[in-house]
Design a protein with these regions (language model features):
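Short N-proximal segments of mature Sec-exported proteins
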Residues: 28, 32-36, 40-41, 125-128, ...
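An amphipathic alpha-helical core segment
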Residues: 146-192
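Residue-level signature of catalytic and energy-coupling elements of molecular machines
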Residues: 42, 112, 207
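A cross-kingdom marker for long, charged
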Residues: 191-222
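N-terminal Sec/ER secretory leader and immediately downstream segment
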Residues: 22-88, 93
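Hydrophobic alpha-helical segments involved in membrane association or supramolecular assembly
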Residues: 33-44, 83, 98, 102, ...
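Mid-length scaffold segments of soluble, non-membrane domains
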Residues: 83-150
Length: 222
């Protein structure tokens, strides 16, 4: 009897690592699935007309100190040009977003099991922040030339750089905001990862609502 119990116990112990490995694999797969779902949803929402311009949460506005200059321009009959500049900034961001898809997917696929386990029990946007750390710079390099192409079509773009450069010299705006292309690229990235984070939070809070058995299994018990 004791021998039988010993054999049974040994068998159960042998199965434990397998169960743990399966659980870890599910965890990593769940994180990947959540990121992919969030990335696709965010890119779909932002990478279309008015994706940025029509959403107050991600709409790209002029930097704080330049808003006063914009009001002055509007008072002197240049309001239409200011509006054209802001619209161009947002259209540039909308045009750039589709370029992020391939990099986002590649980053998701490269996530290790250990990475998944570390962020599974993190905050509502912990996966997105890990993701952002891995992809923000390369996505920015993809965005920049598209933004440059769009802003060149606007007459106020050069004037923005001149005025913003002076404002940065006086410490009125951040140095990185003094170039319109860099500014729009940065804000476009901020908006993209904000939307991905919101999608991740939704999945964590309501995994059943995703319709995915895997996401329900991984996030349902958190």
């Amino acid at each position: 009897m004791q021998r039988r119990n010993l054999i049974l116990g040994s068998s159960l112990l042998a199965l434990t690592p397998l169960a743990q490995a399966l659980s870890e694999t599910d965890a990593a797969s769940g994180i990947r699935a959540a990121l992919e779902k969030g990335a696709n949803a965010a890119a779909g929402l932002l990478g279309r007309q008015d994706g940025y311009m029509g959403n107050p949460e991600v709409r790209i506005e002029l930097p704080g100190a330049l808003k006063s200059a914009a009001k002055l321009a509007q008072a002197t009959g240049q309001g239409k040009k200011v509006e054209e500049l802001q619209l161009a900034m947002n259209r540039a961001a909308e045009a750039a977003v589709p370029e992020a898809r391939a990099l986002l997917v590649n980053a998701i696929k490269s996530m290790s099991v250990d990475d998944g386990l570390k962020i599974l029990h993190g905050g509502d946007d912990s996966a997105t922040r890990f993701f952002e750390a891995k992809t923000r710079d390369p996505i920015g390099l993809k965005f920049l030339p598209i933004v440059q192409q769009a802003t060149r079509k606007v007459s106020l773009a050069d004037k923005y750089n001149a005025v913003a450069g002076k404002a940065a010299g006086f410490g009125l705006i951040k140095r990185e905001d003094s170039n319109i292309d860099q500014y729009v690229t940065c804000k476009a990235l901020d908006g993209l990862f904000l939307m991905i984070a919101q999608e991740e939070k939704k999945i964590r809070q309501d995994p059943v609502g995703t319709g995915s058995a895997l996401l329900k299994k991984v996030f349902g018990g958190l």
